[in-house]
Amino acid sequence: MPRKLYSPKHSSNPYIKDFDEYKELYKQSIEDPSKFFKNLANENISWMEDFKTTFNNQFNNAKWFEGGKTNISLNCIDRHLENDPNKIALIWEGDDPADSKELTYKELHDEVCKFANVLKDLGVQKGSRVCIYMPMIIETAFAMLACTRIGAVHSVVFGGFSPESLKDRILDADCKIVITADEGLRGGKKVPLKSNVDEALLGCPDVKNTLVIKRTGGEINWDDKKDVWYEDLVKDVSNKCAPEPMDSEDPLFILYTSGSTGKPKGVLHTTAGYLLGAHISFKYLFGIRPEDKYWCTADVGWITGHTYILYGPLSNGATTLMFEGVPTYPSASRCWEICDKHDISIFYTAPTAIRALMAQGDDPVKKTKRDSLRILGTVGEPINPEAWDWYYSVVGKSNCEVIDTWWQTETGSVLISPIAGITPTKPGSATLPFFGVKPSLYDEHGNTLEGSNAGNLVIEQSWPSQIRSIYGDHQRMIDTYFGMYKDIYFTGDGARRDEDGYFWITGRVDDVLNVSGHRLGTAEIESALVLHPKIAEAAVVGFDHPIKGQGIYAFVTLMINESFDDNFSYELKQFVAKEIGAIAKPDLIQNAPGLPKTRSGKIMRRILRKIAENDLSNLGDTTTLADPSVVESLIENKQSL
């Protein structure tokens, strides 16, 4: 059934005249990307030294703007000081509605320089890896920007990850310093960040210092040899620190994302290409105006927080809001109260949050005005049309454009999305590709699927902000993204293209789940489950979840003579939360005396997905199973859940 087409509500985008101009610019970006991006890089980046070549023409070993030197912090802060030093750069909204502050670009400059000097005094230098395990407080922005200022490579780990997950990421990136807070605050509850770091560091002997920011003043353990208070060090440092000239391809940050194998991948992004992608996507897609106040609800522990809370908005000289809390605390009106309080004009959130707020009904929204809003964005997973319609009609009062963006940690910036004021939208569709992005649909044999069709979503040519490597394992990067289709980037997502050429993302086609907009590898969760002494084997699949998009469904086979009940199910969920983090806790755990396997021993996840989804009449061919009776017992056990 064709979806309704929504024409843009706002007839103008400051940077693109109309839909025809978008199509012409897009054509130029695909036909001659070197010329197109050379011009954009010169127009949008402040260079310390000009680049010599635009692109090296190697998709799986891409290098953009070689020979050039720049600095992210210079582009995000210093270049705005001459014309608008007193413009608000950051608005911080605390977990408690009474707690908020604003910083101008000049104040941000001073704080970032001081933080950079503290890091230098602790021995951090160009190329050092710095782990940041922080709540959403304003010092987190200082820490990230300070790393970029001195050329250190930050590795931000989401504050919801467990000590075990944190340890793995510290070791993989070989970080010598961890930046954390005494505790975090979320939804009125304290998060024991320093305590988690202490536990993680028991397995990280090479970490020299833990730099601790005081957030709650709660009691924490202290190691005089290793732990240092930020507040003690920052008193004695200068508020001046020159930005380090960085080669275009110098590493900028590592961000871990889940893979279909157990070990998380350290996605490596580099300086100039990432900066350009973040800058131009934010500028064009949101049609940013000088008076805009922008709020992305993500955590900086995810790529959305990197690109669209900090680097995209700040490089454009915009005003960006950081929120410490959760959308439903202290009430389900919180998001919309913040929009009214700070006159937010652009609001960017995940479908999971939209569905959770939608479940609270219209009243919490209608208690607020929301008159300042002009653009509503969505990110992290496909948005179902019902949630899109509610977002558009109830939150936006049918007067705001909805910008449904598709991209990944590995892409660095948005690849498929409407452009505000330009692209007609359809509820549930990410619509059309951004400049320089050449998406296509392939079948499993590598054949191109033309016209209105469905298949595996691939990108056929490089773009500036693409992944450069997996930290310490470039071959894994090639195998993961360029192995299925030679020299073509495989996204791991399925999509369909309609008769208008619009793309509709249908979800993961590999063994990665998208839970509340966060990617989790099934292998990682399975590995955590089988660490439990009572578990012999585990298989994890996704199922449709009304709020999270995908829920986590675990099938577990117990060791001999062990028994399964509700208490043990609860124990297992807590066990996984401790190993990985609460975000990976299974929603449902089913006792599985046996798992459906082929004669070669491969688990047939297709059948497990059908059982998890309760699609029992459509299990497909089970003749290749070593023991087809296993399926009957799984269905029987399913009924008792």
From Swiss-Prot:
Query: What post-translational events are described?
Result: Acetylated. Deacetylation by the SIR2-homolog deacetylase activates the enzyme.
GO terms of biological process kind: acetyl-CoA biosynthetic process from acetate
Reactions accelerated catalytically? acetate + ATP + CoA = acetyl-CoA + AMP + diphosphate
> Could you say which cofactors this protein requires?
Mg(2+)
Keywords linked to the UniProt accession: Acetylation, ATP-binding, Ligase, Magnesium, Metal-binding, Nucleotide-binding
GO annotations of cellular component type? cytosol
- Listed binding positions for CoA are R186, G187, G188, K189, T304, S516
Q: What is its EC number?
A: 6.2.1.1
List every position bearing N6-acetyllysine: K602
Family annotation (InterPro entries): Ac_CoA_lig, ACAS_N, AMP-bd_C, AMP-bd_C_sf, AMP-binding_CS, AMP-dep_synth/lig_dom, ANL_N_sf
Q: Which residues bind Mg(2+)?
A: V530, H532, I535
Matches recorded under Pfam families? ACAS_N, AMP-binding, AMP-binding_C
Q: What GO MF terms are annotated?
A: acetate-CoA ligase activity; AMP binding; ATP binding; metal ion binding
From the UniProt annotation, give the residues forming the signal peptide. Answer: none
Coiled-coil segments on the chain, per record: none
Function according to Swiss-Prot or TrEMBL: Catalyzes the conversion of acetate into acetyl-CoA (AcCoA), an essential intermediate at the junction of anabolic and catabolic pathways. AcsA undergoes a two-step reaction. In the first half reaction, AcsA combines acetate with ATP to form acetyl-adenylate (AcAMP) intermediate. In the second half reaction, it can then transfer the acetyl group from AcAMP to the sulfhydryl group of CoA, forming the product AcCoA.
Please name the PANTHER family in this protein's record: ACETYL-COENZYME A SYNTHETASE, ACETYL-COENZYME A SYNTHETASE 1
Family, per entry: Belongs to the ATP-dependent AMP-binding enzyme family.
Record's protein name: Acetyl-coenzyme A synthetase
Organism per entry: Gamma-proteobacterium EBAC31A08
Q: What is the lineage of its organism?
A: Bacteria, Pseudomonadati, Pseudomonadota, Gammaproteobacteria, environmental samples
